[in-house]
Amino acid sequence: MDIQRIHELVRKVPVAEDVVRYAVRLAAASRPKQQGTPDFINEYVSWGAGLRAAQYLILGGKARALLSGRANVTWEDVRALAAPVLRHRILINYRAEAAGMTVETIIGRLLEAVKEG
């Protein structure tokens, strides 16, 4: 199977609306000073992920589902890709560094704060 065919196949994997909304909420919750943003984001993050992050959470979820032999994307696919997708899109501030926080710590807390469904 060639790369182009795999690419087309990945894009055809269906995603439930609630999983899409979860990916969007996860990316949006990483942005400080937005409605519904967790307090720790406002305290420790200077810059959060944009909407493109949600798109890549879903696209990566499609590839992960296909590689796992599943025909649809799950919340766990999105959660598993949160760190690789969000890591370079979240900029922590000096307060976070002083508190010993890392981007990975922030993403872990974000996954706890943003509920599935």
Where in this protein do the model-derived segments appear?
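C-terminal engagement/docking regions of AAA+ P-loop ATPases
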Residues: P32-G117
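Phosphate-sensing "switch" segment of ASCE/P-loop ATPases
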Residues: M1-Q35
